Amino acid sequence: MQPADCPRGLLPRPCRVLVLLNPRGGKGKALKLFQSRVRPLLEEAEVSFKLMLTERQNHARELVCAEELGHWDALAVMSGDGLMHEVVNGLMERPDWESAIQKPLCSLPGGSGNALAASLNYYAGHEQVTNEDLLINCTLLLCCRQLSPMNLLSLHTASGRQLYSVLSLSWGFVADVDLESEKYRSLGEIRFTVGTFFRLASLRIYQGQLAYLPVGKAASKIPASSLAQKGPANTYLVPLEEPVPPHWTVVPEQDFVLVLVLLHTHLSTEMFAAPMGRCEAGVMHLFYIRAGVSRAMLVRLFLAMQKGKHMDLDCPYLVHVPVVAFRLEPRNQRGVFSVDGELMVCEAVQGQVHPNYLWMVSGSSDSPSGRDSQRRPPPEEPI
């Protein structure tokens, strides 16, 4: 529990951190890197820690469900984005989820997908770096102890599943690359480059209905009771079996190359997907690419994305919209969804963003600017 005299938006000194580390993530060097790179910096900064190694998929989820969180000032996750996904969903499954999700989180890149860490590195004002340089930068952010509130995305599927995302949901090209590049995990993040070119060689079209609630029309809210669930109220969503509300935008095209919902700036350490910058409180980026785009243009887009210049190409097939909610209904079960890099069965899904819903170690204690007073304020103190 944070001392009463600790400034708002800061971790205390000394600080106690539970580190969850996946020793098999990425190239399998996370534990060695923690001992050689991370540990000395934490000890110098008076950050005491307990290291717990995950042994299987969803182990981190089980650990945070059962952990006595009051023993720790923060939870650090050293792996890829998938382990942070497990931790956040584990916190939201606890009986005390409302207080548990306020426990500050820290992303230490140690997997093959480190987009969240890359985004936090960008928010701190650092240049785009990868591998050990990114790990050191993120460790130093933890040593500096500054916190920022971040958005959370809640998702609801046709089969009744409810889950949460801290980074992204993708369907089509990006999700397929996530799935098909698993066999190249030992290559680290370069697996995504390899997977991208394999998928370009056999480009697929995905059919479905996409609808969204743009930021400018978000004033009209649905009664919270219309979508009953545990967790934060979904004030913009109606049940999936009902049509979307009339003030939503329904995309007329139904053939896509990809659909991407992104809460942060980076899709990987070298994919600066949202150069328009950090989302405001209660806003997320929706990107989609319509069918008809050439392979040559896709190559240009992905190469330009490394520097955040893809929007400068003015590709007529690429659309970006700031949104607060969305619904995606695939016409068939072809393909998969990827949520924070974790695979999810292909079925109708909808979601909405919850502003300033969790604390993360970042380079600034400033919160994203808000659009209106409807957003949830960050907690008075992280716990």
Curated annotation (Swiss-Prot):
GO terms for biological process: blood vessel development; brain development; calcium-mediated signaling; cell population proliferation; cellular response to growth factor stimulus; cellular response to hydrogen peroxide; cellular response to phorbol 13-acetate 12-myristate; cellular response to starvation. InterPro entries: ATP-NAD_kinase_N, Diacylglycerol_kinase_cat_dom, Lipid_Phosphate_FormReg, NAD/diacylglycerol_kinase_sf. ATP binds at residues 22-24, 54-58, 86, 111-113, 185, 191, 340-342. Substrate binds at S79, G80, D81, G82, D178. The active site is at D81. Residues 363-383 are annotated as: Disordered. It comes from the Eukaryota. It is a peripheral membrane protein. One of its GO terms (cellular component) is clathrin-coated pit. GO terms for molecular function: acetyltransferase activity; ATP binding; calmodulin binding; D-erythro-sphingosine kinase activity; DNA binding; lipid binding; magnesium ion binding; protein phosphatase 2A binding. It is found in: Cytoplasm; Nucleus; Cell membrane; Endosome membrane. This is Sphingosine kinase 1.
